[in-house]
């Protein structure tokens, strides 16, 4: 599995600066259409290398990348050699959390793009719509490869996505999927045990509790 990084600083060296916003949006759009993870990076809060507060243009830039559907917004120089690394991180979190309040509820529109692409995407689409209709607290995805969590992530559900896997490399991959909370589970031999343990660790981690509505999405062959 591969992902794409939209490194605007490097792109600005290779193409005219005025073309960078167009290609950023196109790359994010194509990654979302093909379920590829996409990271938007470089010069996002660049002024915070020197100043404790960003410019309003930088705040808007970060928010627009999230509105466009990027999985990750990433700091670079701001935390690598800036004077205000913690402040930059906190500001990035605040922007993301505020912007995602507007994204919530858009899953029905986003899902229409994906629902006819494959059996797997159709199943994920139906699951997200069910979770939204039931106001579910979480969608629990037991997964061997991270594929189920990745597909569900691109549909931007209102519910938390909990990606459960026994494999560390899969858990690391799921860290960059939008809205996915990776949790490690034990290796089980039956589908029933896999699902049961996924629910147990989700509750132990505090993502769900007794009485919550939870949807379990598993593309594991039964």
Specify the residue positions occupied by each region the protein language model found.
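Long, charged amphipathic helices and adjacent flexible linkers at domain junctions
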Residues: 91-128
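Glycine-rich phosphate-binding active-site loops on the catalytic face of alpha/beta enzymes
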Residues: 6-13, 62-84
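A structural motif
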Residues: 1, 70-71, 136
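Conserved small/polar residues in nucleotide/adenosyl-binding loops
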Residues: 220-222
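Nucleotide-binding motor/catalytic cores of P-loop/tubulin-like NTPases across gene-expression machines
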Residues: 148-150, 156-193
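C-terminal binding/interaction regions
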Residues: 210-211, 216-217
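Conserved alpha/beta-domain cores
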Residues: 1-42, 48-59
């Amino acid at each position: 599995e591969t992902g794409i990084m939209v490194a605007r600083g490097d792109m600005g060296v290779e193409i005219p600066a005025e073309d960078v916003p167009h290609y950023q949006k196109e790359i994010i759009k194509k990654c979302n259409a093909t379920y590829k993870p996409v990271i938007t990076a470089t010069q996002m809060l660049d002024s915070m290398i020197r100043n404790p507060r960003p410019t309003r243009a930088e705040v808007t830039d970060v928010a627009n990348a999230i509105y466009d559907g990027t999985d990750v917004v990433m700091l670079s120089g701001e935390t690598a050699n800036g004077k205000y690394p913690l402040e930059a991180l906190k500001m990035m979190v605040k922007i993301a959390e505020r912007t995602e309040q507007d994204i919530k509820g858009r899953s029905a529109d986003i899902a229409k793009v994906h629902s006819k692409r494959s059996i797997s995407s159709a199943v994920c689409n139906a699951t997200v719509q069910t979770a939204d209709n039931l106001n579910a607290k979480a969608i629990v995805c037991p997964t061997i490869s991270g594929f189920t969590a990745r597909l569900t992530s691109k549909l931007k559900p209102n519910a938390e996505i909990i990606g459960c896997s026994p494999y560390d490399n899969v858990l690391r991959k799921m860290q960059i999927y939008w809205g996915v909370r990776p949790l490690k589970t034990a290796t089980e031999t039956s589908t029933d045990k896999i699902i049961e343990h996924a629910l147990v660790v989700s509750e132990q981690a505090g993502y769900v509790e007794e009485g919550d509505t939870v949807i379990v999405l598993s593309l594991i062959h039964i």
